[in-house]
């Protein structure tokens, strides 16, 4: 039985090196989808590149941990910027949910303004949309807008409460990440999903060329290794041999 494989490159708009890596992995590799940070420093560059790559499906990478928000968020920002202290606020059950709801809507409208169309789907930077307090907001928004949502079902305990019309892949994997990136690792992700019986799978990735912005990231050089693996001709053949068809959330 043929299975759907969505290879989604996160962080479109983070930097020019990230943007070029994603485009390369789409044009000469197996990346079929990406998600864009509308407040990223290189988002305009990402928009420009995307015009020459119409086959690349583009979703929105909801941002609550980096850069400046599009709306006033006094309950989440420090000195006007977002940061990883959101984890502490979540643990303290002190997240400003109304502010987050407004910011989600603003980033969504900004995406449409930039790309001229709705995103194919939603996910988030550092997976913050999977926080128990935030997930219902994002799930409801995605269902209302008729777009798909990345769902990591491992930390999700209330999957029975999902909106009836919410679209997603059956499986999601973030395992293609870290210091041991290889073609074998990618194929193991597919084999694990097949054993679970997933008929559709999203694999998250971060292919990039190294630039000054990426150098500052804790996850730097493995992005270049990801790019090498994702553009391997042998990987594309191995995917087909396992009965997977490359696609995007438009196929879900």
UniProtKB/Swiss-Prot annotation:
Gene3D superfamilies: Glycoside hydrolase/deacetylase. GO terms for molecular function: chitin disaccharide deacetylase activity; deacetylase activity; metal ion binding. Its EC number is 3.5.1.105. Its cofactor is Mg(2+). It is an enzyme of class 3 (hydrolase). It is found in: Cytoplasm. Mg(2+) binds at residues 61, 125. InterPro entries: COD_ChbG_bac, Glyco_hydro/deAcase_b/a-brl, YdjC-like. Pathway: Glycan degradation; chitin degradation. Involved in the degradation of chitin. ChbG is essential for growth on the acetylated chitooligosaccharides chitobiose and chitotriose but is dispensable for growth on cellobiose and chitosan dimer, the deacetylated form of chitobiose. Deacetylation of chitobiose-6-P and chitotriose-6-P is necessary for both the activation of the chb promoter by the regulatory protein ChbR and the hydrolysis of phosphorylated beta-glucosides by the phospho-beta-glucosidase ChbF. One of its GO terms (cellular component) is cytoplasm. The keyword Transcription does not apply. Keywords: Carbohydrate metabolism, Chitin degradation, Cytoplasm, Hydrolase, Magnesium, Metal-binding, Polysaccharide degradation. It catalyses: N,N'-diacetylchitobiose + H2O = N-acetyl-beta-D-glucosaminyl-(1->4)-D-glucosamine + acetate; diacetylchitobiose-6'-phosphate + H2O = N'-monoacetylchitobiose-6'-phosphate + acetate. Belongs to the YdjC deacetylase family. ChbG subfamily. This is Chitooligosaccharide deacetylase. The gene is chbG. One of its GO terms (biological process) is polysaccharide catabolic process. Homodimer.
